[in-house]
């Protein structure tokens, strides 16, 4: 069982409070995650989740769509979001800055073009978003189909259920967990067990935040605290 000591959490929380209070755009001391600078910094993730779910429209999907390309079209629309500088998907590396092959969605794009890949990909995505089975096998099959792209796979699970799953940026969270005294290496380690270790640490951060922040704490608030 993952446990963050009160001492390590309080040191990290003081650092967070100081970062909020001393920032040039600060409106004052940290109060909660729904007001002030903390809300300004991280509210885009709440917006992104709602916007992406609206584009995904998984509730409208039909089993017969698998292989048609419709499911992949909805999934790609839920990833490639860029309304403006602030309202965009900066969680998944989807923009082809060095060509499509450099992105995390390259295999989604390939599946969209190739019927032999499209059927399998859309069956998997249908299972992820429309069936309430054990998520572990689906996670493992998604990594086989789309590559061990932590940003992509975790983002899809985030869209499935943000009360249970959160997106990963493997270059950021290990530093936060190290400071909290619960090291967790994530780079090049996209897998179900590693992802569960990430989520366990977020739940432990959430438990500590509930002690010191008066407002209701969501899992996404723990994610923002670590980000």
Describe these PLM feature segments.
Residues 153-161:
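Contiguous, well-ordered alpha-helical segments that form the cores/surfaces of helical PPI scaffolds
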Residues 1-146, 161-227:
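An N-terminal alpha-helical hairpin/helix-loop-helix interaction module that forms a charged
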